[in-house]
From Swiss-Prot:
Coiled-coil positions: 132-153
UniProt cross-references to CDD domains, sorted A to Z: I-BAR_IMD_IRSp53, SH3_Irsp53
Encoding gene per record: BAIAP2
Statement: the UniProt record of this protein carries the keyword Coiled coil: yes
Post-translational modification: Phosphorylated on tyrosine residues by INSR in response to insulin treatment.
Chain segments carrying region Disordered: 295-369, 447-466, 525-552
Organismal lineage: Eukaryota, Metazoa, Chordata, Craniata, Vertebrata
Residues bearing PTM Phosphoserine: 261, 323, 325, 336, 346, 366, 384, 395, 454
Phenotype when changing residue 142 to E: Abolishes actin-bundling and filopodia formation
Protein name: BAR/IMD domain-containing adapter protein 2
Gene3D superfamilies from the UniProt entry: Arfaptin homology (AH) domain/BAR domain, SH3 Domains
An example Gene Ontology CC term for this record: excitatory synapse
Organism (species): Homo sapiens
Amino acid sequence: MSLSRSEEMHRLTENVYKTIMEQFNPSLRNFIAMGKNYEKALAGVTYAAKGYFDALVKMGELASESQGSKELGDVLFQMAEVHRQIQNQLEEMLKSFHNELLTQLEQKVELDSRYLSAALKKYQTEQRSKGDALDKCQAELKKLRKKSQGSKNPQKYSDKELQYIDAISNKQGELENYVSDGYKTALTEERRRFCFLVEKQCAVAKNSAAYHSKGKELLAQKLPLWQQACADPSKIPERAVQLMQQVASNGATLPSALSASKSNLVISDPIPGAKPLPVPPELAPFVGRMSAQESTPIMNGVTGPDGEDYSPWADRKAAQPKSLSPPQSQSKLSDSYSNTLPVRKSVTPKNSYATTENKTLPRSSSMAAGLERNGRMRVKAIFSHAAGDNSTLLSFKEGDLITLLVPEARDGWHYGESEKTKMRGWFPFSYTRVLDSDGSDRLHMSLQQGKSSSTGNLLDKDDLAIPPPDYGAASRAFPAQTASGFKQRPYSVAVPAFSQGLDDYGARSMSRNPFAHVQLKPTVTNDRCDLSAQGPEGREHGDGSARTLAGR
C-alpha cells in the first residue's frame, strides 16, 4: 500500500468517527425524544381506553339487570374483558418500548459521545506516532545516502543504508496496518451502533406483533358470537317470554315498586282482587297488531305506531330497559293495561284508621266525576306529583292540565295524558280538580254514593261550607278545606300527619262527612280581622262570639 493510499484511508477513518459523533448521535437523541413523545401519546391512549371500557362495563351492568337484555349485558362484559386483555398486551408493549429501547438508547448515547472522542483521539495519536517514526527513518536514510555519495569509500555506508531501508519498510507496514485496522474499527463501531438500534427496535416489534396477534386471536374467537347476540333486536329471551306467559296466566300484576335491583327492573306482586280496566279508545286499533306481531314495546301501558312519542331517548331522561310483551289477546291486553297501576299496599282493617309513614290509606274505586262518555274529560292539577323511578306514573306540576284517557278511576288512581309534557301514566285523582265544559275548575266528587273517595276527598262536597280553623277545638282536629282554597295535600298517598286525627272519628267517618249536618250562622263581629286595634273587652267579646258559634 502506497503512502498516499494510507493517508486516504486515514482520512476515511477520521470521517467515520466524526460522522458518528456529529450526525449519528444527534439523530439518535432526536429519535429518543420522538420516542418519548410517542410513548406519552400511547400512555394517554391506554388511560383513555381504561375509562372507555370502564364505561362499557357499567353499560353491561345495566343490560345484565334487564329481563330482556341480560345476554347482551354478558356480551358487553365479554367485550370489556377481551379489550382489557388486549390493553394489557399493549401495556406490555409500552413497557418493552420504554425499557428495552428508549432507556438503553438514552444511556448509550450519553456514554458514546465520550467514548468516541477518546477512541478518535487515541487513533490519531497512535497514527501520528507511527507516521513520525517512519518519517524519522526516511530522514536518516536520506542523510546516510548524502554522506555515502561524498565519501571516497561508499561501501562503508552500504550496510547501514540497508538497515535503514528495512526499518523504513517495517515502519511503513506498521503504519499501513494500523490505519487499516483503525478504519475497520471505525466501521465496526458505526455498524455496532446501528445494529444495537435495530436489535432494540426488533424487540419492540416482537412485542407489537404479540399485541396484535393476541388481539386478533381474541377478537376472531368472540366476534361472531357477539354479532349473533345482536342480530335480532326484536327477539325476546325465552326466560322473559316464560315470565310474561306466567304473569298472563296468573292474572293481573303491576310493574310498580321496582326495587329489587339497582335499576329497579322487576315485576311487582299482583294486586288482590284487581280487575282489568277497559282499553282506551286509542289502543283499540292496535289490539290486532299485538296478536299479529311477535313483540311490541309497551311504555306506560300504551303501544302503537306512535311509540316514538314515548321513547326514552326523545324528550325525557333515559329509562331502564323493560322486557317486551309477548303476543296477547284483547282480554290479556286489557289485563296488562290495568296492571300498569301502582302497587297497592295491604289495606288495614275497617275498624282501624291508624297509619304509619310507610303505609298508604286505602284507595277507593270511585268513578271519575263528570267524565263525559262522548268526549275526554280534563282535570287541573292542584298539587305537584313526582313519578320518581316508576315509569308507569305520570309527573306533573301544580296547574298542569291533564286529559283523562280511561272512563273510570281505579283505587283512587286515574290514567291520563299531560297536555304540557304529552306524557301518559297513572296519577292520584285526588291531586286534581275536574274542569267544567266552560274551562272552570271544580272539586270532583264520587258518582257512586255507596263508595267512598280517598280520605283526602271526604270533604269534597259542593254544598258544604267548612268553618275556619279557630271555630272550636273539634274543627281543628280535622283539616279545613274549602272549594276555593284547596291547598292541603290530599291523603291518597302516605302522609303520616293525617293519621293522628283519624283515631278520634272511628269507622263512622268512613261512610259520610261527620260535619255534614252542621249549619253555621254568619258572625256579627269582625273582631278577628284586627284584634290588636281593640281593647281587652273587644277581644273578649270576639272570643265569646266564636265560642257561641262553636257551641251551636
